[in-house]
Curated annotation (Swiss-Prot):
GO CC annotation: cytosol
CDD domains per record: YajQ_like
Reported function: Nucleotide-binding protein.
Similarity field: Belongs to the YajQ family.
Protein name: Nucleotide-binding protein CYA_0935
Organism encoding this protein: Synechococcus sp. (strain JA-3-3Ab)
Length: 163
């Protein structure tokens, strides 16, 4: 029996599910009557999506469609950081959507402080873009997870490596 238990708090998403959601959105754009003739392109890059389409109205419809497909695939909508739309030339509109991954240092400090203030028997430690929480009691760690799930953070949190 282990003397201490721990888990990691990370902010990540399943890239394959994102690829599937984008693919489903592309297929529906080709089928939908209002979006069929807009020559819409959705490019998936390493840390972002680029949506290029004919008008601002079509861009709003595509954004809603993409968010719906992502939610159905089990992705958190907090991973999308929509930048302001910009003109792409030739009466076209482009929007860059950055994909949020990892916990930044300020948020990690806030999470660690919140854990320290509420739970005296567990020790949070910041390790790069994750927060490791360790303690002697499994029930305390479960309580930490429940407390963090009730909070609203600007990124989607996952709890991994529970041992």
């Amino acid at each position: 029996m282990a003397s201490t238990y721990s888990f990691d708090i990370v902010s990540d998403f399943d890239r394959q599910e994102l690829v599937n959601a984008v693919d489903q959105a592309r297929r529906e754009i080709k089928q939908r009557y209002d979006l069929k003739d807009t020559q819409t392109e959705i490019e998936l890059e390493e840390g972002s999506l680029i949506i290029t389409t004919a008008s601002e109205m079509a861009l709003n419809s595509i954004r809603d469609l993409l968010l719906t497909k992502a939610a159905k695939r089990g992705l958190s909508l907090k991973i999308f950081d929509f930048q302001p739309p910009e003109s792409a030339g030739g009466n076209r509109v482009r929007q860059v959507v950055r994909l949020k991954k990892g916990i930044d240092a300020a948020l990690a400090k806030q999470i660690a402080k919140q854990i320290r203030d509420n739970f005296k028997k567990v020790q949070p430690s910041i390790q790069g873009d994750l927060v490791r929480v360790s303690g002697k009691d499994k029930d305390e760690l479960q309580a930490v997870i429940q407390m963090l799930k009730q909070q609203d953070y600007p990124v989607a949190l996952q709890f991994v490596n529970y041992r």
